[in-house]
Every structure is written in structure tokens, then in C-alpha cells.
Amino acid sequence: MSVFDLFRGFFGFPGPRSHRDPFFGGMTRDDDDDEDDEEEEDSGAWGRESYAFDGFHPTEEFGFSFSPRGGMRFHGNFGFDDLVRDFNSIFSEMGAWTLPSHSPELPGPESETPGVRLREGQTLRDSMLKYPDSHQPRIFEGVLESHAKPESSKPAPDWGSQGPFHRLDDTWPVSPHSRAREDKDLDSQVSQEGLGPLLQPQPKSYFKSISVTKITKPDGTVEEHRTVVDSEGRRETTVTHQEAHDSSRSDPDPPRSSALDDPFSILDLLLGRWFRSR
């Protein structure tokens, strides 16, 4: 079976009148097809008059032409006329071959919905983010939303108490202010109360720095300075004095007699005994 037979069977066209493949040419021909072609040429199964259509020559196997109505027609005996006719009908219904009768117009300023338009002097923050998830009504064009939609004035259910983690509220209690999802005016609150109530207390680390300095004076007195600085910046200095130790412990050399310092005293010690003995 040739590729052309598969293509024709896929689209449901009738079977061929010969074993020759005029559409794909020699791509699917083999030796058996060549022998069949020679036999058919001898028997004259393909008449010369079958090719003469719309001025086509007998040697031509495939062709197409354009009709005045704008359609395209294939010439040949393989059922392409029905295929092209079906495609023309499909695209004509879809409007793919026809241009729009009028050009598209750009929307003008009058196409805007007057209900969504902001009031004069009203900011986008006040209209969109003032009460995002609360049950309080919004204000559009000076009219409350509850007046326009009475059924929307129902209070919103408290989904926080029914959530999957509502049992953890006892462990980590949540204040009512944290549950309220509203866009608060922080500028006026800061100007009135300051940043203290708004900022959450942060945990602080405590540390202490201790420095000790000892000074030994010439008389042997030891002076000790103990300075303690805590995390708050407070400084406390304590000074202690320690008296000198015993002279026998502090001075390793024994005291010398004052007589040894005088040379006459030394001579008196050495020669005095000799003269006194005489």
C-alpha cells in the first residue's frame, strides 16, 4: 500500500482507478508498480481524452485553477474537489475568508460605568483598601453600599474561631486588634499617641562587663579599681586599698648595719681589737 492510499483512506476518498500514484510521483513507486504501468499503457486503460479537462495536456497529471467566484479547484481523479469544497464551506461559516464589515471602534470615555467612578477628591486608597475584609459598608458616589444592597449588610462570620488552628488560641491568645483586617489611619494615631503603642516590645539581651585594674604604689600599698558596666549603660566603679606586707617578707635582702657604710668604722672594727689587746 502506498502513502497516497493511506492519505486517501484517512480522508475517506474513493479508491483509485489504477495502481499508479500521480500525486506523489516516484516516491512510492517500486518494480511491481512499474510493471503494472507498462501493462496498463499497452491496454490503453488510461484514455487520452480523460486528461483533456480545462485545457490540460495529456502528459499533465495534477493541477488546480482559481474560479471567478474565488474558490480553488483541483483537477484530477483523486477526490480533492470534495475536500476543497468542504474546507471552503467550513471557513465561510467561520468567517475566516471574509473581512469584518465595519472597523472596530475604541471605547470612549462615555463607556465607563458611572457607579465605579470615584468621587471628586476621593483617593484610590479610601475606595479600595479602606475596609477590605470587614462587614462595614463602603462609600461610592456618596451612597452607602448597604443602601444599594440590603442583603450585604449581614455581619461577616467569624471564621477565625472555626479555623483548623482555633485550639491554639488558648496557648497563643490573639488580641482583637490583630483580627481586625482594616486599613487604619496610622498617621493620625502616631501623631497623637506616638510610636510606643504601635511598636511591639522586642526581647532584650542582658550582659555585664567587668574590668579590674591593680596599682602597686612605692610604699607597697595595692590599689584595686573594679568597674562594672551593664547592658543599660550604667557604670559602677569600686576602689579598694590593701596595705603593704611585713618588711621581712617584702624585702628579701637582710638589713645592713649603718656602721659598715662608714670606712672609719670598718678600720675601727679591724684595728681596734688589735690595739686594745696590747
UniProtKB/Swiss-Prot annotation:
Region (Disordered): 15-50, 99-262
Compositionally skewed regions (Acidic residues) per UniProt: 30-43
Region (Involved in ATP2A2 binding): 202-244
Single Gene Ontology MF annotation: interleukin-1 binding
Subcellular location: Mitochondrion matrix; Endoplasmic reticulum; Nucleus membrane; Cytoplasmic vesicle
Segments for region (Required for ITGB6 binding): 269-278
Tissue expression remark: Present in striated muscles (at protein level).
N-acetylserine: modified positions: S2
Domain of life (superkingdom): Eukaryota
Biological process according to GO: cellular response to cytokine stimulus; granulocyte colony-stimulating factor signaling pathway; negative regulation of apoptotic process; positive regulation of granulocyte differentiation; positive regulation of phosphatidylinositol 3-kinase/protein kinase B signal transduction; positive regulation of transcription by RNA polymerase II; regulation of actin filament organization; regulation of actin filament polymerization
This protein's UniProt keywords: Acetylation, Cell membrane, Cytoplasm, Cytoplasmic vesicle, Endoplasmic reticulum, Membrane, Mitochondrion, Nucleus, Phosphoprotein, Sarcoplasmic reticulum
Residue numbers spanned by region Involved in CASP9 binding: 174-205
Stretch list, region Involved in GNA13 binding: 175-246
Region of interest (Involved in PLN binding), ranges: 202-224
Biased composition, class Basic and acidic residues, residue ranges: 132-152, 216-254
Function, as annotated: Recruits the Arp2/3 complex to the cell cortex and regulates reorganization of the cortical actin cytoskeleton via its interaction with KCNC3 and the Arp2/3 complex. Slows down the rate of inactivation of KCNC3 channels. Promotes GNA13-mediated cell migration. Involved in the clathrin-mediated endocytosis pathway. May be involved in internalization of ABC transporters such as ABCB11. May inhibit CASP9 and CASP3. Promotes cell survival. May regulate intracellular calcium pools.
Family: Belongs to the HAX1 family.
Name of the protein in question: HCLS1-associated protein X-1
